[in-house]
A protein has these predicted regions:
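Conserved small/polar residues in nucleotide/adenosyl-binding loops
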Residues: 458-460
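Active-site cavity-forming subdomains of large catalytic enzyme subunits
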Residues: 61, 120-126, 130, 135-254
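N-terminal secretory signal peptides that target proteins for export/translocation
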Residues: 1-13
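Active-site-surrounding "flap" and adjacent substrate/cofactor-binding loops of secreted or lumenal enzymes
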Residues: 71-115, 128-130, 148-169
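Catalytic phosphate/nucleotide-handling subdomain of diverse soluble enzymes
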Residues: 65, 69, 76-92, 246-249, ...
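Bacterial N-terminal signal peptides
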Residues: 18-28
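Accessory "access/gating" subregions that flank catalytic or transport cores
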Residues: 47, 185-213, 220-231, 239-244, ...
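Boundary at the C-terminal end of the N-terminal hydrophobic targeting segment
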Residues: 31-36
Length: 460
């Protein structure tokens, strides 16, 4: 992605893995008696642990495909005169156009799926690295719910400030500049943390003027996967991470995505997956107060989709939400900027409904629809990736031997992980293994669930 990158000092790998081993042993000792006494009921929901690991692997792989595909078109089309007209299906496979700030992207000149082959690494981005951070903190603290202090300490340790960030060159000819890969509300929250603030005060509009932006809805979806089948517990786990950067309607929308991810374990690839996802979205939208802006936006986009006889013509609905919300302002929403939570929530629903459960089509529409396009493409890529599982994703993109490694130190720092002696590199399979341990803990501590003595099934 760039010719030079500064790697911070890497230490204490052995110490980390020893701590992880002790944590696993501690979890085993704590739960052996509970597992021995657990009564399994035929009516209980059962989750195959190895299958769940494959699904978590698929979440990271699908999210990375969606993220890096969406980054090609990110902020290219935001409804301003200088960026019009919007993209359509006809633009797929054609040359990328500059973002509204005037730059292209270094990783692709063509609007198409961006796939990283084995031997190379998927780069971290703000759509993936904060979820990685939160999963790491849960494993580190052996906790089912993070405290405000744990979140603050984790952010300060693993993210850069604007002053100590490495120098970054977007293109070979670019002038190097410091880049901490934090923007909008994330950046505001970190500055507040440096001043001693902790969540939820880091999203208080009194101090954080960007708390109505998109940040939380792209950094917290993983909490749904850490609490399968219990969306209310997932939302409780995500309460502070969401309110690290979001308040009001932005926080409500983040809850919506967490809810959908929590119940996604019940879904599998099928001819009716699109309809199942639509029903799940309708259920998740019950979280919204009846007269709230997110509720009205959801109902408008859903109604426009349902009434559109051509289910390939997603552009018709995109143009309608542009007119209704950006040009005219309706349903209590006044458009401010292309990072707004609400306009991107509406845009994400377009790709969810018209994508109809098809991984490729959903990512394609999300990348073309406009505004902050890498966010819905990453969100739905991750959700569908989880539903499909890693093995099925690789069949969908069989033309490429897809990479399973993740370069977390592209954007963040101080993570005690390496792959083939390369610091800051992780593997999706190992990430899924660690996250399954978190799921085990959450189910036993928060959901009165059981794990059988063979560690093969989770009973909820």
């Amino acid at each position: 992605m760039r010719s030079k990158f500064y790697f911070p000092p890497f230490r204490n790998i052995k110490k980390y893995f020893l701590a992880l081993l002790l944590a696993c042993l501690h979890l085993t000792l704590l739960t052996n008696e509970a597992r021995a006494n657990c009564v399994f009921d035929e009516d209980q929901v059962k989750i195959n642990i190895e299958d769940y690991k494959n699904r978590l692997h698929g979440f990271w792989l699908g999210q990375s495909i969606g993220n890096w595909t969406g980054l090609i078109t990110e902020m290219d089309k935001i409804g301003s005169k200088s960026t019009m007209p919007f993209y359509t299906d006809n633009d797929w496979g054609k040359s990328d156009q500059p973002a509204f700030w005037g730059e292209l992207v270094p990783h692709s000149q063509t609007i198409d799926f961006y796939l990283v082959s084995d031997g190379n690494h998927w780069g971290a981005d703000d759509d993936t690295d904060m979820e990685y951070l939160y999963a790491h903190l849960h494993a580190l603290h052996k906790s089912s719910k993070l405290t405000p202090e744990q979140i603050r300490e984790g952010w300060l340790k693993h993210t850069y400030s604007e002053e100590d960030a490495p120098f970054y060159k977007k293109f070979d000819h670019s002038t190097p500049h410091r880049e901490n890969f934090l923007w909008v509300s994330n950046e505001k929250a970190r500055i507040l943390m440096e001043d001693g603030f902790v969540p939820p005060e880091t999203s208080n509009p009194k101090y954080n003027s960007k708390s109505s932006m998109i940040d939380a809805q792209l950094t917290t979806e993983i909490f749904g996967l850490l609490s399968p089948g219990n969306p209310q517990n997932a939302i409780d786990m995500a309460y502070l991470p969401i309110r690290t950067t979001a308040t009001g309607n932005a926080a409500l929308v983040a809850n919506f995505y967490v809810y959908m991810h929590s119940l996604a374990f019940e879904l599998h690839p099928s001819d009716i997956l699109g309809e199942n996802l639509k029903e799940l979205a309708i259920e998740a939208a019950q979280l919204f107060p009846s007269k709230s802006t997110p509720k009205k936006i959801f109902e408008y986009v859903l109604s426009h989709y349902d009434n559109n006889t051509d289910k390939q013509d997603w552009e018709h609905t995109r143009n309608a939400i542009y007119e209704r919300y950006q040009v005219q302002s309706n349903d209590g929403y006044i458009y401010k900027e292309p990072f707004d939570s609400m306009i991107n929530f509406a845009a994400s629903l377009i790709s969810l409904f018209y994508g109809d459960g098809d991984l490729k089509r959903t990512i394609q529409i999300a990348a073309l629809v406009g505004w902050d396009s890498d966010n819905p493409s990453a969100t739905w890529g991750g959700l569908l990736g989880f539903i499909y599982g890693a093995n099925s994703i690789k069949n969908v993109f069989s033309e490429t031997n897809l990479s399973d490694t993740f370069w977390i130190h592209r954007t963040r720092r101080n993570f005690p992980t390496s792959y083939k002696d390369e610091p800051g590199i992780d593997h999706f399979h190992e990430m899924a293994n660690r996250e399954t341990l978190i799921v085990n803990r959450v189910i036993e501590e928060k959901m009165s669930g059981c794990i059988d003595n063979n560690l093969s099934l989770i009973h909820i």
